[in-house]
Amino acid sequence: MEYLNIIFLQTYKILFLLVPVLVSVAMIVWLDRRIWAFVQKRQGPNVVGPFGLLQSLADALKYIFKEVIIPSSSNKVIFILAPIVTMTLALVSWAVIPFSTTQVLADINVGVLYLFAVSSLGVYGIIMGGWASNSKYPFLGAIRSAAQMVSYEVSIGVIIINVLLCVGSLNLNDIIMAQENLWFIIPLFPMFVIFFISALAETNRPPFDLPEAEAELVAGYQTEYSGMMYAMFWLGEYANILLMCAMGSILFLGGWLSPIDLYPFNLIPGAIWMIFKILFLFVLFALVKAVVPRYRYDQLMRLGWKIFLPLSLTWVVLTASYLFYFNLLPVN
């Protein structure tokens, strides 16, 4: 009976985390469309529900009732597994995201490493989908995605090292508490900018949406997908975008900490501050999508390997030297 209670409690915790994440994905899709429409001086979704808030629900119902077509020449098992892998990896990453000192599903001591490892695995779902489709456009999109994500993961990893040098811990709550007096966005602002741009590339967002460039590759690795399988790729993509916004808020914006430690700001729950910071970063994501044209593939690779990687490595040396010289290193 005790085991059943433990299983029930853990299942409840998982659902309590995943359901809000999935609802948030639906809401940010609506927000993404509204921001894009605002920049282009049009209304965007405004028919289904008040202010068009139920548009994502209508889209979900449409995908549920659409036929799932599996190409006859595809590798059917891998073709079906690909969107499942993509969505699952995007959702399990949220297990270690803290919304306060206690509001976290798994408060592990290697939270940053876990996040980096799981988010890096996301490319496998895209590669599987592109290869299993047995079609040239999905395959080209998958190759592009693999090269792009691997390139920018290196920069993100080096940026995380900058933060870890200042904290001395891989625990996400420790990283947040280390910013109690000063958010890391101030001393590490160049790293925040590189992290933000790398996160755009990591999540295949414009101007780095080359794996699904409509003018060149139809829909890239998603070309042969339809119905709920296509929707699962879509859910995984937006869950990853939210995850990168959460990572940015934890690493640079103090996570669930109040920006001003004064009344009445310190009365607001930490989870609310965390949500506000995630939304702020997502609005920046959406504005970039609306105003910046797509990069060429060679420009994307050059930016990652010739500019971001050397700059982030240089900043690691500068950060370590500064902390060592002033005896501020958090480790003995």
From Swiss-Prot:
Root EC class: translocase
Disulfide bonds: none
Subunit text: NDH-1 is composed of 14 different subunits. Subunits NuoA, H, J, K, L, M, N constitute the membrane sector of the complex.
The UniProt record lists the keyword Zinc: no
A GO biological-process term: aerobic respiration
Native source species: Pelagibacter ubique (strain HTCC1062)
Name of protein: NADH-quinone oxidoreductase subunit H
PANTHER family: NADH DEHYDROGENASE SUBUNIT 1, NADH-UBIQUINONE OXIDOREDUCTASE CHAIN 1
Catalytic reaction list: a quinone + NADH + 5 H(+)(in) = a quinol + NAD(+) + 4 H(+)(out)
Subcellular location: Cell inner membrane
Membrane topology: Multi-pass membrane protein
GO cellular component labels: plasma membrane
Chief location category: membrane
Listed EC numbers: 7.1.1.-
HAMAP family: NDH1_NuoH
Alphabetized PROSITE patterns for the sequence: COMPLEX1_ND1_1, COMPLEX1_ND1_2
Keywords per UniProt: Cell inner membrane, Cell membrane, Membrane, NAD, Quinone, Translocase, Transmembrane, Transmembrane helix, Ubiquinone
Function, in words: NDH-1 shuttles electrons from NADH, via FMN and iron-sulfur (Fe-S) centers, to quinones in the respiratory chain. The immediate electron acceptor for the enzyme in this species is believed to be ubiquinone. Couples the redox reaction to proton translocation (for every two electrons transferred, four hydrogen ions are translocated across the cytoplasmic membrane), and thus conserves the redox energy in a proton gradient. This subunit may bind ubiquinone.
InterPro entries according to UniProt: NADH_UbQ_OxRdtase_su1/FPO (IPR001694), NADH_UbQ_OxRdtase_su1_CS (IPR018086)
Molecular functions per Gene Ontology: NADH dehydrogenase activity; oxidoreductase activity, acting on NAD(P)H, quinone or similar compound as acceptor; quinone binding
Keyword Chaperone found: no
